[in-house]
């Protein structure tokens, strides 16, 4: 669709693409909305969520594909099947190129439009968290210096988001909780800092529990779901750490 649509039309088309599960096109509609918004004003909550859902679905299927291909690659290497290993490596490389492209697309949008135009604290945390998330996705499959850089960029974005969240958002706010969830996963999976991951998840969970009675009805479901995920991770990570200590 080469024609330029109005902002409302882009929102409608993004919803249509979402219903049809055509997430690459959903991304395109939301990118056009953001790039074409003059002046580059702040997105509404609905627009922001549509953008997030679009990218989350595209990156989600690619991350799942990468994990499957990587696991097949390990199996083929253990079987010493050189021909298959070579084919799988090439295929993994193709998936990684797509992952890099999607990540750089949203990161470019965040740096050029979304973060600079964010005025509300909630928006700032949302976009800085998103920036951290997509640098983290790069760190998942990059190696060497590229992985180190992606991890450093993740840390900077998450820390900036955390500073605003702790200052301005309630401990029960779903965006603050989501940040704590993803930041702790980053510590656990990318930095291999199990203790820091656990302490961060535990603190976020306990601070939210202490203020649970202040939760508004509209965000109750979102907040309690993320709290459940924080608790699930804590349980899993604690038992993993216990197993490692037992083995040692």
Swiss-Prot record:
Q: Name one Pfam family in it.
A: 14-3-3
Residues the record lists as Phosphothreonine modifications: 214
Q: Where in the cell is it found?
A: Nucleus; Cytoplasm
Result of knocking out the encoding gene: Disturbed levels of several metabolites (e.g. beta-alanine, ribose, aspartate, pyroglutamate, glutamate, asparagine, fructose-6-phosphate, myo-inositol, 1,4-diaminobutane, palmitate and shikimate). Enhanced freezing tolerance associated with enhanced cold induction of cold-responsive C-repeat-binding factor (CBF) target genes in the double mutant lacking both GRF6 and GRF8, probably due to the suppression of ubiquitin-mediated degradation DREB1A and DREB1B degradation by the 26S proteasome pathway. Enhanced freezing tolerance in the triple mutant lacking B1L, GRF6 and GRF8.
Give an example GO cellular component term for this record: nucleus
Task: Please give the InterPro entries that the UniProt record associates with this protein.
Answer: 14-3-3 (IPR000308), 14-3-3_CS (IPR023409), 14-3-3_dom_sf (IPR036815), 14-3-3_domain (IPR023410)
PROSITE patterns, per database record = 1433_1, 1433_2
Residue positions, PTM Phosphoserine: 70, 112, 193
What keywords were assigned to this record? Cytoplasm, Nucleus, Phosphoprotein
Q: Subunit composition?
A: Interacts with the isocitrate dehydrogenase IDH3, and malate dehydrogenases MDH1 and MDH2. Interacts with CINV1.
Q: What does this protein do?
A: Is associated with a DNA binding complex that binds to the G box, a well-characterized cis-acting DNA regulatory element found in plant genes. Involved in the regulation of nutrient metabolism. Negative regulator of freezing tolerance that modulates cold-responsive C-repeat-binding factors (CBF) DREB1A AND DREB1B proteins stability by facilitating their ubiquitin-mediated degradation; this processus is counteracted by B1L.
PANTHER family found in the cross-reference section: 14-3-3 PROTEIN
Q: What name does the UniProt record give this protein? A: 14-3-3-like protein G-BOX factor 14 kappa
Say which species the protein is native to: Arabidopsis thaliana (Mouse-ear cress)
Organism classification, top ranks?
Eukaryota, Viridiplantae, Streptophyta, Embryophyta, Tracheophyta
């Amino acid at each position: 669709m080469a024609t330029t649509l109005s902002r409302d039309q882009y929102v409608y088309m993004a919803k249509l693409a979402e219903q049809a599960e055509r997430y690459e096109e959903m991304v395109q509609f939301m990118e056009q909305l953001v790039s074409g918004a003059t002046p580059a004003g702040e997105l509404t909550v609905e627009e922001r969520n549509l953008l997030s859902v679009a990218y989350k679905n595209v990156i989600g299927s690619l991350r799942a594909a990468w994990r499957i291909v990587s696991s097949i690659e390990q199996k083929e290497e253990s079987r010493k099947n050189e021909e298959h290993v070579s084919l799988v490596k090439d295929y993994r490389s193709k998936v990684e190129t797509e992952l890099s492209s999607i990540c750089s697309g949203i990161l470019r949008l965040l740096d050029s439009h979304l973060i600079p135009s964010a005025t509300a604290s909630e928006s700032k945390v949302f976009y800085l968290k998103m920036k951290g998330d997509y640098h983290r996705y790069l760190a998942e499959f990059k190696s060497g210096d590229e992985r180190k850089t992606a991890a450093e960029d993740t840390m900077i974005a998450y820390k900036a988001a955390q500073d605003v969240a702790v200052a301005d958002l309630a401990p029960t706010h779903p965006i603050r909780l989501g940040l704590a969830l993803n930041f702790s996963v980053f510590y656990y999976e990318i930095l291999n800092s199990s203790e820091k991951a656990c302490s961060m998840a535990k603190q976020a969970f306990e601070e939210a529990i202490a203020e649970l009675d202040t939760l508004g009805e509209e965000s109750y479901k979102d907040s309690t779901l993320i709290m459940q995920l924080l608790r699930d991770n804590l349980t899993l990570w604690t038992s993993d750490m216990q197993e490692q200590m037992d083995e040692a």
